[in-house]
Each structure stands twice: as structure tokens, then as C-alpha cells.
Regions:
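Acidic carboxylate-rich catalytic motifs and surrounding loops in phosphoryl-/glycosyl-chemistry enzymes
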Residues: 12-13, 46
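Active-site-adjacent betaalpha module
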Residues: 2-3, 19-154
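Short beta-strand segments at enzyme active-site cores
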Residues: 6-12
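Short, active-site-adjacent cap segments at secondary-structure transitions
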Residues: 15-17
Length: 154
């Protein structure tokens, strides 16, 4: 924001599913997330935030080719979004300490996060690039976009 780069908040719309129904308590953003009037909010309907959403058209409109990706559900929403963005040839920086998940039946959340950070560091992208960096490494970066994925996928 300090450099006037656009910020996009992605919010899961689970209308009709019984979870994360639009305008319900579980749909609301966390109080810690500060949404400014200049920020963009885009509804998502699946783990992949590009699926049937306005995200691709908004990124095209803003002439964005570089993405910072953060969010909830590392192993669902964040992973699906990264895979989808790579097939669209975006240059991606995953914020290493900017995504989270819950405990899973066979893995603690910490191990899930550690595993996906490793996967993304060792991935062979299409025409874009993918990096995993700690927030401290990128806070002064001059990239053109930040994606904040606040949606829940599972």
C-alpha cells in the first residue's frame, strides 16, 4: 500500500453449501486484516481462486504479472491457487510465513506448511517463476501486486 500497489482480498463465497455463506459470521474477514477502501475484494467459489471468479480479468486490467501469495488452507486454497497461477505464467512469490492451515489427520499444521514451502521451492514452473521468501525478505520488494487469499477451502 505504501507504494500504491493494488491489494486484492480473496474471500470464499460458500453460498448454498452451508459453510462460509456470504454475509455470515464465518464468512467475515478476521479483524486483524485491515481492508482499505482502495483494496479490491473478489469472491471465490472453489479452492482455486481463479475458478469462475473475476480475478483473472482484474489482474489483466491492472496489467499485473507478479503475484505475492498468502492465505489460509495451505494445502487447499493456497496450493490450488499457486498451481493455477503457474499455468497462467505469472511470476509468483509465496510468502513463506504468510500462509497457514489446520491440523490434518496424519500431519500437524506446521509440517503441512513446511512440506508445501519445500514443494514450491523445488517446483519447475511453466514460463513464469516461483519463489518462496520470508516476509522480511520481501517487504521492500518493488513487485506490482499482492494477493491475499483469505478464503477457506476445506
Amino acid at each position: 500500500r505504501e507504494r500504491n500497489f493494488p491489494v486484492i482480498y480473496i474471500q470464499h463465497d460458500g453460498t448454498g453449501t452451508g459453510e462460509f455463506e456470504k454475509n455470515s459470521l464465518d464468512w467475515e474477514n478476521l479483524d486483524e486484516l485491515i481492508v482499505e477502501p482502495t483494496d479490491f475484494r473478489i469472491d471465490k467459489y472453489a479452492n482455486d481462486i481463479f475458478y469462475k471468479s473475476e480475478l483473472q480479468s482484474k489482474l489483466t486490467e491492472l496489467n499485473v504479472t507478479e503475484l505475492f501469495i498468502t492465505g489460509c488452507a495451505t494445502d487447499f486454497c493456497v496450493e490450488s491457487t499457486i498451481q493455477s497461477a503457474l499455468t497462467k505464467d505469472y511470476n509468483i512469490t509465496v510468502v513463506e510465513n504468510g500462509h497457514t492451515t489446520g491440523e490434518r489427520p496424519h500431519l500437524k499444521a506446521e509440517k503441512v506448511i513446511e512440506h508445501y514451502n519445500w514443494v514450491w521451492r523445488n517446483m519447475i514452473p511453466t514460463n513464469g517463476k516461483i519463489e518462496v521468501k520470508n516476509f522480511e525478505e520481501i517487504k521492500n520488494d518493488t513487485t506490482t501486486m499482492a494477493i491475499i487469499n483469505t478464503g477457506f477451502g476445506a
